[in-house]
Amino acid sequence: MRTELLSKLYDDFGIDQLPHTQHGVTSDRLGKLYEKYILDIFKDIESLKKYNTNAFPQEKDISSKLLKALNLDLDNIIDVSSSDTDLGRTIAGGSPKTDATIRFTFHNQSSRLVPLNIKHSSKKKVSIAEYDVETICTGVGISDGELKELIRKHQNDQSAKLFTPVQKQRLTELLEPYRERFIRWCVTLRAEKSEGNILHPDLLIRFQVIDREYVDVTIKNIDDYVSDRIAEGSKARKPGFGTGLNWTYASGSKAKKMQFKG
């Protein structure tokens, strides 16, 4: 629902003035709007304490889920700030997966920087990565060989429809030792575990937005997300070749990039 805070943001971003035919523009603005929603809730310690009360049930739900995902207790926090600037660039010069950051300061004067990846969608799964096979394999640590060529075939064919049953089985088997690194890289651009590195998110925030309206939010730390995807990929039919991700192609890339949804 549109709370007082969320209603103000909808006004600020002019969402209701956008024609319903402008899907791309609307999606972009909603993306920025929901990033700002998080930034405002965690703007400072006064805002966080205010919105973590029963007077603001929706914002309390969001802030409580975020703190729980980080295993943090509000009583131990003496200061908080949020930002969406100075997020840095990847080694390749591109934008990181981080959309915003929150910094918590605790009673013992230590602090913790939490990079966030924030998305909104009406769908259960959203696009988390769109890269070519060379970039993917380099990032995950997959060397030249059968596994890499099977991934390349998926990219070139833009699906697994032309795979034989044996090729599907081989891709699943060969990818199994890399599953954790593969999933982690897709959502953070780093195959190894990381914490507090501004280039690599520690939390995934997924707003469910249907017909432009807030419905719910899911917030997970990276370890829990990876575990959930592996559990999904371990089901009998081995979805996503054991990764639990949807493998598809990047629109307009002409078989030069793959896209993963999760």
From Swiss-Prot:
This is Type II restriction enzyme MspI. Disulfide bonds: none annotated. Coiled coil: none annotated. It holds the Pfam family Endonuc-MspI. The keyword Nuclease applies. Keywords: Endonuclease, Hydrolase, Nuclease, Restriction system. GO terms for molecular function: DNA binding; type II site-specific deoxyribonuclease activity. It comes from Moraxella sp. InterPro entries: Restrct_endonuc-II-like, Restrct_endonuc_II_MspI. Its EC number is 3.1.21.4. It comes from the Bacteria. GO terms for biological process: DNA restriction-modification system. It is an enzyme of class 3 (hydrolase).
